[in-house]
């Protein structure tokens, strides 16, 4: 399925967040309080982005991660929208808006907080990794 077809399958919120650089409501989203073992992939491209092993409760109202699974799968861009100075995070392949990265994460884990919109992600549970084509990430959970 090509990107155009995948975009047609997104919900209104998923499209707003990933394609229009939107932000979903804090604390009222799918993955803020979700801590099952597995990985989070780009809702548009399916590329692996984050692991539950790097997720933590930052209290910000959105899923927070200390790092991406593979740094090369995300891009960072200086963002001055809404009168703020911050760093936007996008998926490399689909160019989906994911959220922002801030330098206030746990210092013992690198000091970064990837604050990511749930609407930009799809969760793949550890037990489904092999069947969904992400078997190479099973080793993360051993």
Swiss-Prot record:
Gene3D superfamilies: Peptide methionine sulfoxide reductase (2.170.150.20)
Organism this protein belongs to: Lysinibacillus sphaericus (strain C3-41)
Annotated Gene Ontology cellular component terms: cytoplasm
GO-annotated molecular function: peptide-methionine (R)-S-oxide reductase activity
MsrB domain span: 3-126
Keywords linked to the UniProt accession: Oxidoreductase
Biological process according to GO: protein repair; response to oxidative stress
Enzyme class, spelled out: oxidoreductase
Domain of life according to the entry: Bacteria
A Pfam family recorded for this sequence: SelR
Reactions this protein catalyses: L-methionyl-[protein] + [thioredoxin]-disulfide + H2O = L-methionyl-(R)-S-oxide-[protein] + [thioredoxin]-dithiol
Protein family per UniProt: Belongs to the MsrB Met sulfoxide reductase family.
Active site residues of this protein: 115
EC number annotated for this UniProt entry: 1.8.4.12
Protein name per Swiss-Prot or TrEMBL: Peptide methionine sulfoxide reductase MsrB
Claim: Oxidoreductase is one of the keywords in the record: yes
């Amino acid at each position: 399925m090509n990107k155009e077809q995948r975009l047609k399958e997104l919900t209104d919120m998923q499209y707003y967040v990933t394609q229009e650089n939107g932000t979903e409501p804090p604390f009222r989203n799918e993955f803020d309080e979700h801590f099952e073992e597995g990985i989070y992939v780009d809702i548009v491209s399916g590329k692996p982005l984050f692991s539950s092993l790097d997720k933590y409760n930052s209290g910000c109202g959105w899923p927070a991660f200390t790092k991406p699974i593979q740094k090369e799968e995300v891009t960072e861009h200086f963002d001055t929208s809404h009168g703020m100075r911050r760093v936007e995070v996008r998926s490399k392949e689909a160019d989906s808006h994911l959220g922002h990265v801030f330098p206030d994460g746990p210092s013992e884990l690198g000091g970064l907080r990837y604050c990511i919109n749930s609407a930009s992600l799809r969760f793949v549970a550890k037990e489904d990794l092999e069947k969904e084509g992400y078997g190479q990430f099973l080793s993360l959970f051993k």
